[in-house]
Amino acid sequence: MRIASSSGILMDANGKANGSAPSALVAYFLGMGFSREMVFRAIKEIGNDNNNTFPHLLQLLPFLSGDTDSEQILELLLTYQILEEEDEEEDVNWDEDDTVDNFDRATYSDGSGDEDFLQEMSEKDEKIKSLVSMGFPEDEAMRAITRCGLDASVDLLVESIYAPASAGNVYFTNLSDYEDTEFSSFGGRKKTKLIDGTKKKRERYRSRPQWNQVPFDGSHEEPMPLPNPMVGFSLPNDGLRSVHRNLPDHALGPPFFYYENVALAPKGVWTTISRFLYDIYPEFVDSKYFCAAARKRGYIHNLPIENRSPVLPIPPKTISEAFPSTKMWWPSWDPRRQFNCLQTYVASAKHTERIRCALGRFGDALPPAVQKSVLEECRKWNLVWVGKNKVATLEPDEMEFLLGYPRNHTRGVSRKRDIELLGIHSKLIQLHTTSLC
């Protein structure tokens, strides 16, 4: 049996609103000014399993008597409030007349039931918690999951957070957990400067070349500085620098080893890896110097670095060089020359169709707000222009070409697996190993 309370909330015989939460709790938050839809949405995310008795919600009950800090209780609702405001801004960016729906909403709203919804939210929360525990802001974590998909690995999410906002620009996080560290070229003591990530932009690393860094002895967990530009020990045909590094005696010569990971890993990761690999300093490289896609990676190896030579054929370094057919359709307001990091998830057909409809509606008189929104989507999903007002995702064979693999290298497995198999730039590895020939 259900009855209506004085606040107009339906209650069951146990005094629960809509059979899912104590009516007093719901009424309390409604009285604080939150909308009914937002309150029930928060309850739905926490869970509606009657056997669970809502342990999280029950923890909120002491607040009704003033025994608990309000900040902890309101955090979820305030987060929803911020997200709804962001959704409204995105809708305005697309079309002031509300004729074009928000892309993300269309992409991820599939009409699934409550059980699927709760499972999806639980997985999303776990990944957000993992990223936050690494030191990333929660809003960045949520945007990364939106870009890469819920099933993306944490490693891919980390890389996505640090992918440049526009290809060709170097982006650093604004976290105080990451430090600017300057090394003496004579192996002296390091000077570390903490930057307040909430108030200051991260300064670019301007220390001595990375091959003169002092080795890590494992006595600290400070992050390794990243060079700018991120070109590794040498670029092909780079005769301007004389590079030399000293390896421990027990790491000289064969057997050779080669370890690869994302360059912008959380604090302490590279230090720990280096400690277990003879304290060898990583070689940090951004693949944008070798191909048309940015991909920041670090490599710890004991390979010789002298006499490296480029591997032919040299891959194209811009989108127009890689895909000349896109030139005739590329709009002047899209300044991209390179792709962001390649992702294992791509935009859906519905997603690209909505972009086409939005552009077709305005014709040649495209408002700046719509240009900005479309460009953001193109950068997020690495879309290319294949027709008038028409964008498309990169196919696996096109990604193979960008990363230096032969055509059909990954053919025969699922599309998702195709892309996952392209995690390493083959031309870069070939460059690093040419000194062995």
Swiss-Prot record:
Transmembrane intervals: none
Domain SAM-dependent MTase DRM-type span(s) in chain numbering: 243-437
Keywords: DNA-binding, Methyltransferase, Nucleus, Repeat, S-adenosyl-L-methionine, Transferase
Record-annotated UBA domain positions: 20-60, 120-164
Subcellular location: Nucleus
This protein's GO CC annotations: nucleus
BP term (GO), one: methylation
UniProt xrefs under InterPro entries: SAM-dependent_MTases_sf, SAM_MeTfrase_DRM, UBA, UBA-like_sf
Taxonomy, superkingdom: Eukaryota
GO terms, molecular function: DNA (cytosine-5-)-methyltransferase activity; DNA binding
Function: Involved in de novo DNA methylation. Involved in RNA-directed DNA methylation (RdDM).
PANTHER family attached to this UniProt entry: DNA (CYTOSINE-5)-METHYLTRANSFERASE DRM2, DNA CYTOSINE-5- -METHYLTRANSFERASE 3-RELATED
Homology family: Belongs to the class I-like SAM-binding methyltransferase superfamily. DRM-methyltransferase family.
Protein name: Probable inactive DNA (cytosine-5)-methyltransferase DRM1B
Species this protein is from: Oryza sativa subsp. japonica (Rice)
